A protein has these predicted regions:
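A short, Lys/Arg-rich alpha-helix, primarily the initiator
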Residues: 1-17
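Short alpha-helical elements of helix-turn-helix
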Residues: 5, 9, 33, 49-52
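Key DNA-contacting residues within the recognition helix of helix-turn-helix
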Residues: 12, 37-38, 67
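Short, Lys/Arg-enriched C-terminal cap helix and immediately downstream tail that follows
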Residues: 14, 48-49
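Alpha-helical residues within the helix-turn-helix
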Residues: 16, 27, 57
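Short alpha-helical DNA-recognition segment
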Residues: 20-38
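DNA major-groove recognition helix of helix-turn-helix/homeodomain DNA-binding modules
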Residues: 50-65
């Protein structure tokens, strides 16, 4: 799946909309806090589809909404 970096802005926006910290999103999605930091900072340029699905599920949105 090629999502480019469109997920970066959406991820932060959706997390902030829920008023969640990075720690909370990491806990709710089941991914490590350090991985989430790397994703949000762009150090992980192409997160695995499985990771994006976990994040979308935790945020209560479709994968399409996360990466669009």
């Amino acid at each position: 799946m090629s999502s480019g970096n469109s997920y970066l802005k959406n991820l932060k926006k959706l997390r902030n909309k829920k008023d969640w910290t990075q720690e909370r999103l990491a806990r709710e999605s089941g991914i490590s806090f350090h991985t989430l930091i790397k994703i949000e900072s762009g150090r992980i340029k192409n997160p695995r589809l499985e990771t994006l699905i976990k994040l979308a599920k935790a945020l209560g949105v479709s994968i399409d909404k996360l990466v669009s």
